[in-house]
Structures are given as C-alpha cells and as structure tokens.
C-alpha cells in the first residue's frame, strides 16, 4: 500500500469495499435461501408459524457462526502462510 499514491490508494480502497459488499450480499442471500428452504414448509398463511420462526433463528445463528469460523480459519492459514514466507 505504501507504494501507491493517494489516488491509487483511494481506488484500491473503493475496490476492496465493493468486494466486501458483494461478499456480504452473497452471504446474506445464501443465508436467506438456505434457512427459508429448510424451515418454511407451510404456505397456507402469510405469517410464519412459531416452529418456523424458531427454525429460522437457529438456522441463521448456525450459518453465521459457521461463516465466522471459516473466516477465522482462513485468517489463521493466511497468517501462517505469510509467516512461512518471511513477511
């Protein structure tokens, strides 16, 4: 980053922020699709049943914890790789 001028740093930051937003939207979309498919089975009412609500809460918590754990492992692997390369 130090080798970039101010304009290049701003452009780099913009690209990083766009990628982060895209990744967040993909995560959210996957969460909604998976939990809805797994938990919502009754389409006779426009409201969720208490069983469906509970299922969605558990599903989303589990999904987010899993995503967080994967992110942590990725950071650990990246740090180990950087350390082994002498960075």
Curated annotation (Swiss-Prot):
One of its GO terms (molecular function) is unfolded protein binding. InterPro entries: Mito_inner_translocase_sub, Tim10-like, Tim10-like_dom_sf. One of its GO terms (cellular component) is TIM22 mitochondrial import inner membrane insertion complex. Pfam families: zf-Tim10_DDP (PF02953). Its main location: mitochondrion. It is a peripheral membrane protein. GO terms for biological process: protein insertion into mitochondrial inner membrane. A motif (Twin CX3C motif) lies at residues 35-59. Signal peptide: none annotated. Heterohexamer; composed of 3 copies of TIM9 and 3 copies of TIM10, named soluble 70 kDa complex. Associates with the TIM22 complex, whose core is composed of TIM22 and TIM54. Interacts with the transmembrane regions of multi-pass transmembrane proteins in transit. Belongs to the small Tim family. This is Mitochondrial import inner membrane translocase subunit TIM9. The gene is TIM9.
